[in-house]
């Protein structure tokens, strides 16, 4: 697949593009929507300078910071998740790299969550090959590590971690036989070519991602992008085109409509489902920011006749 081929797919008449994406989607998936909730186990004071992120220690934002939660409180949430019918429990921590002093505790938590009969997922920043192997041995099923944007636009968003470091982490995850979860953020001021190049980078990953989070910028006051923009720099038609193109390129991946969904109309979300979205974050909170409400999601899923497959991520 080349950049020009991706452009050609994206530029097809919108109805034709959505129809092709829907046909591919229906061939590989049923009528279910994966519902995920995201738990932050360590919040804020991150040394990274990602210009969109309120958890960066470089910026003055109003988030409530906390250190790594204790094991018992995390396991209590995991048990509640299982009792509610969840199949997977995912934990996110605001680290550039997991501290050595916390690694064994996180690995132990993964093992105990796994022993509850749940699938496990974490996002902990960069990890090396040895750490990936140990996480796999602890029972880890999925690791999330987003590329965020194209290689070319990346230096405009992050300077504390090189793009190739992200690729290396994904390579370590894949080599350890852990499922890869990897996507990006739209509406940060990137060009269309940057979006196409992001898709090309995802196609060239060491292992095909099992799930692809598609985020739109949530401008948070105190962050550089939050002070620059009042909303995501992408319109609904561009978003739907991007999703449909992603579905065509990744027929067997779960496409998750993630951050920014609370700012989308029900009609826009419906078009996103038609274009290939089959996973959403479910719950009123998404890490540190508000998410679409549970009542709103229940109303929309019922209206569309979509079946929910509840997981806690």
Swiss-Prot record:
User: What's any GO biological process attached to this entry?
Assistant: biotin biosynthetic process
Superkingdom of the organism of origin: Bacteria
Listed as disulfide-bonded, the cysteine pairs are none
Cytoplasm in keyword set: no
**EC number(s) stated in the UniProt entry for this protein:** 2.8.1.6
Q: Which SMART domains would you find in this protein's record?
A: BATS, Elp3
Question: Which leading EC class covers this enzyme?
Answer: transferase
Note whether Metal-binding occurs among the keywords: yes
Q: Which reaction does it catalyse?
A: (4R,5S)-dethiobiotin + (sulfur carrier)-SH + 2 reduced [2Fe-2S]-[ferredoxin] + 2 S-adenosyl-L-methionine = (sulfur carrier)-H + biotin + 2 5'-deoxyadenosine + 2 L-methionine + 2 oxidized [2Fe-2S]-[ferredoxin]
Ordered alphabetically, the record's keywords are: 2Fe-2S, 4Fe-4S, Biotin biosynthesis, Iron, Iron-sulfur, Metal-binding, S-adenosyl-L-methionine, Transferase
In this chain, [2Fe-2S] cluster is annotated as bound at 90, 121, 181, 256
- State how the cofactor is bound: Binds 1 [4Fe-4S] cluster. The cluster is coordinated with 3 cysteines and an exchangeable S-adenosyl-L-methionine.
Quaternary structure and interacting proteins, as annotated: Homodimer.
Q: What does this protein do?
A: Catalyzes the conversion of dethiobiotin (DTB) to biotin by the insertion of a sulfur atom into dethiobiotin via a radical-based mechanism.
Q: Which family does it belong to?
A: Belongs to the radical SAM superfamily. Biotin synthase family.
This protein is called Biotin synthase
Q: Source taxonomy lineage?
A: Bacteria, Pseudomonadati, Pseudomonadota, Gammaproteobacteria, Thiotrichales
